[in-house]
């Protein structure tokens, strides 16, 4: 393999690596957006659960024990 062939091979590999890096970056950006969205949904669900839990806590405190 002469020098020119080696340079062409390296340039080819570099182009392939650039494409791969760009594809990986695109996937990473997409996953980050999905992660942020899931975090927002989780925060909303936790808030809703806490609100619902506080509603049930007041109901249970007012109810007499089951043995009465």
UniProtKB/Swiss-Prot annotation:
It comes from the Bacteria. The gene is slyX. Pfam families: SlyX. This is Protein SlyX homolog. Transmembrane segments: none annotated. Gene3D superfamilies: 1.20.5.300. It comes from Pseudomonas syringae pv. tomato (strain ATCC BAA-871 / DC3000). The lineage of its organism: Bacteria, Pseudomonadati, Pseudomonadota, Gammaproteobacteria, Pseudomonadales. InterPro entries: SlyX. Belongs to the SlyX family.
